[in-house]
Amino acid sequence: MIGNKHYQEVFARQMYNYKNVFDPSVGFMRGKGLDGKWQEPFDPLEWGGPFCEGNAWHYTWSVFHDVEGLIDLFGSDQKFTIKMDSVFTLPSTIKPGTYGGVIHEMKEMELAGMGQYAHGNQPIQHMPYLYSYAGQPWKTQYWVRQIVERLYNATERGYPGDEDQGGMSSWYILSSLGIYAVCPGTDEYVIGSPLFKKATITLENGNKFV
């Protein structure tokens, strides 16, 4: 679509719409009604409603293409990272909300025991890498290594969720190599915590990336 003015204008209008669903008074993305007003009541732990298979703790970080803009909504790097810290330190409380009962994504989050971090579903999988955008790459490295070692293993509980479009395995492979594309389709990768001293990737043209 390079050079297509129509789609350029469409995406230019849409790419910053996430700012319209961020409520600074509560520090979360949240749903709005047809009248443009915030949906009430609001509980960031409650699943469903405006969120598919997740809650506000999961979807607030889903701004893959403009992380700097997301950080600005919180007011500073420090406020942003403090909020991310809370994801891991909160209890793994489940509130089914509009689902009316526990679905497997909820149970996977509970079993993981990493607070409100729900690695079993895609919306929050990139979140540990966002520390690097806010000046705390060591937290990216720490939490990525925790996820790799605690949630993946060679047992019946060694795969932490659905393999939707290859997301679960590709997260592990890239994170094990020490790189991750927060915004897929770009040539930008965040450095994480590699498991190997050396790795060689054979590209489709036969070249080697070492």
Q: Residue spans of the language-model regions?
A:
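Active-site core of glycosidic bond-cleaving carbohydrate-active enzymes
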Residues: M1-L195, A199-K208
